[in-house]
Amino acid sequence: MPTIQQLVRKGRHDKTAKVATAALKGSPQRRGVCTRVYTTTPKKPNSALRKVARVRLTSGIEVSAYIPGEGHNLQEHSMVLVRGGRVKDLPGVRYKIIRGALDTQGVKDRKQARSRYGAKRG
């Protein structure tokens, strides 16, 4: 416990809250280039091959981003738009790629929740 004199000299400092999406540098989304597109397996109770891309953002940081939806057209050097949002069963994946923006196509034959997957109404 500091003395009153120590508080007069130094004061108290607020703790800064840690940001979950630091690589976006305060932006809602960030553009990036895929450096690697691959599949990975989820944590213990689940079993699948989750589609993930390694993306170099315009902020200069390289992050792992999840590719949501069934099927995708991404490959190395594809331009993608990345938003925040982690994938609970993939450790270290804290970003998602926005479907239907830049080089990423929307999900084909999607009928419900279309806006999340960049699917047109037709």
UniProtKB/Swiss-Prot annotation:
GO biological process: translation
Keyword annotations from UniProtKB, A to Z: Ribonucleoprotein, Ribosomal protein, RNA-binding, rRNA-binding, tRNA-binding
CDD domains documented for this protein: Ribosomal_S12
Molecular function, one GO term: tRNA binding
Listed GO CC annotations: small ribosomal subunit
Record InterPro entries: NA-bd_OB-fold (IPR012340), Ribosomal_uS12 (IPR006032), Ribosomal_uS12_bac (IPR005679)
Matching SUPFAM superfamilies: Nucleic acid-binding proteins
Assembly behavior: Part of the 30S ribosomal subunit. Contacts proteins S8 and S17. May interact with IF1 in the 30S initiation complex.
Primary role: With S4 and S5 plays an important role in translational accuracy.
Stated family: Belongs to the universal ribosomal protein uS12 family.
NCBIfam families, alphabetized: rpsL_bact (TIGR00981)
Annotated protein name in UniProt: Small ribosomal subunit protein uS12
Organismal lineage: Bacteria, Bacillati, Actinomycetota, Actinomycetes, Mycobacteriales
